[in-house]
UniProtKB/Swiss-Prot annotation:
Positions with biased composition (Pro residues): 383-414
Record field: compositional bias (Basic and acidic residues): 354-363
Transmembrane helix keyword on record: no
Protein name: Melanoma-associated antigen C3
Record carries keyword rRNA processing: no
Keyword annotations from UniProtKB, A to Z: Phosphoprotein, Repeat, Tumor antigen
Name of the encoding gene: MAGEC3
Domain MAGE: 184-384, 456-643
Tissue specificity as recorded in UniProt: Expressed in testis. Not expressed in other normal tissues, but is expressed in tumors of different histological origins.
Annotated spans, Disordered: 347-421
GO biological process, one term: negative regulation of transcription by RNA polymerase II
Any single GO CC term annotated in Swiss-Prot or TrEMBL for this entry: nucleus
Amino acid sequence: MLLPCHWVLDATFSDGSLGQWVKNTCATYALSPVVLPPQPQPRKKATDKDYSAFHLGHLREVRLFLRGGTSDQRMDSLVLCPTYFKLWRTLSGSPGLQLSDLHFGSQPEGKFSLRRAVSVKQREEPQDWPLNEKRTLWKDSDLPTWRRGTGYTLSLPAVSPGKRLWGEKAGSLPESEPLFTYTLDEKVDKLVQFLLLKYQAKEPLTRAEMQMNVINTYTGYFPMIFRKAREFIEILFGISLTEVDPDHFYVFVNTLDLTCEGSLSDEQGMPQNRLLILILSVIFIKGNCASEEVIWEVLNAIGPWSALAGFADVLSRLALWESEGPEAFCEESGLRSAEGSVLDLANPQGLAGHRQEDGRRGLTEASPQQKKGGEDEDMPAAGMPPLPQSPPEIPPQGPPKISPQGPPQSPPQSPLDSCSSPLLWTRLDEESSSEEEDTATWHALPESESLPRYALDEKVAELVQFLLLKYQTKEPVTKAEMLTTVIKKYKDYFPMIFGKAHEFIELIFGIALTDMDPDNHSYFFEDTLDLTYEGSLIDDQGMPKNCLLILILSMIFIKGSCVPEEVIWEVLSAIGPIQRPAREVLEFLSKLSSIIPSAFPSWYMDALKDMEDRAQAIIDTTDDATAMASASPSVMSTNFCPE
């Protein structure tokens, strides 16, 4: 059995010479620790002939404190855990430790070799420990916890901050001798984030930027950290860094010619190829045939999930609020109610149900259900519409004027208009194009990447909460109130936050904000959906309920127009259902995902068929009414004709 010990080594260096080592040993087991008391000796230059070898056993942890030769100020500390050490003893009996390639400034301090540990019996006899012919200790059978063979040599990294590491040249570090794993991983992770921010901003980068913003004091390890980060973004995102200047000037190049949402517009945003690569890799590993359960098991490990599932989760929680009350809602969603009646939507996860708590940084991806019909377009992976990859733009005079117009309503009930269904979709596409042309004339905000995404989500959630409170109290809201109460120090991002919050409450609750005083930016609320629901029958507005209706219709529509009646009535028991055409549901989903309706081919055809059926019913009704009207005079003439 080996004796695990905790060693604290306090070293003193002076002019490149080994000084006195002071060691205190405490055993972690019940066995007596080995104590090597320091022996006083005059300082002299270290040479190999001044030392004879002895070995220490298995160490649980070694903490090495490094001090200046003429000062008691501690430079740094190095923790090694666990490993095997070879210690040296001078001819006078004073113990010393040799470290390999450990440079402070340009002064090497000797060699550090790893050897197999010794047994407890040998530990009890620290003097003249025997070595075999190969100058290694004991047999493998006597060392159950040591499996590295006859011997191993490893170099330790430099830890002194503010000094050149690993000799005179910063690039002289062998890449096979890394930092501690957690430090290396942390630096690689930070560099990956920095590279992605540069990619989103469409900016080149230099080695000096990476060293100054990420690498910091670990400049000697830059080649290793940069290589790992470069491989990571190339494998996962399909982005390659190409050096275009001998002075380490790099630009981003897409290595995969893939069609995805990010490549359909000039806005690069966060690369989305990684999800496709991941799914294709899983399919390839499984022999070109992977079940949906296997795919989702992999996707659940990294975060993306169905957009419609997230949307349904949000609205079902709101249904719980309406039917069961605030207490049941808060208990279900893990939120708290403020003052017993006000919904606390400051938690973005409770509001939108779309952000998981893993902290990495959240990229939203599409789910397999969103690929229905063989199309490549993606839908947002959250209940709330996804935040833009680049910030929206605003006109010079302030935030964009909010139109009270909501989703497109039913066409005029005439046979001609009802039959021209393709024109409806063309009109919807034209409206979308006109909106894009209008936004092209706005001025750009500071890039959203400079504001952390989680902070942006939180501000949007807080503003939605504030707007809903104002809606419940039937009070108008001003820009000054929003800036003072919610936005606070993020005033530069007000147009972006306000735009997302307004879009959210309009899509989910059917509430539009109309600017009734452009000078003071005073807004009032207006219902955009011409729907009959409980809240419109009384003077009390309360929490808007349109979202519940849209939820149920969406559920029926998504399930292929076939859902068990028990499931529907279980949800609708407290609110009262109303039928809406499939076209309006499809328009709503299209607006929510910013995709044209024809991107959902099967649902699109169903909606067209539904419209044709409705149009035919109107025609039949009109024909019947005409026939009855034409038949009426003849009947009357028969009744009143003279005998």
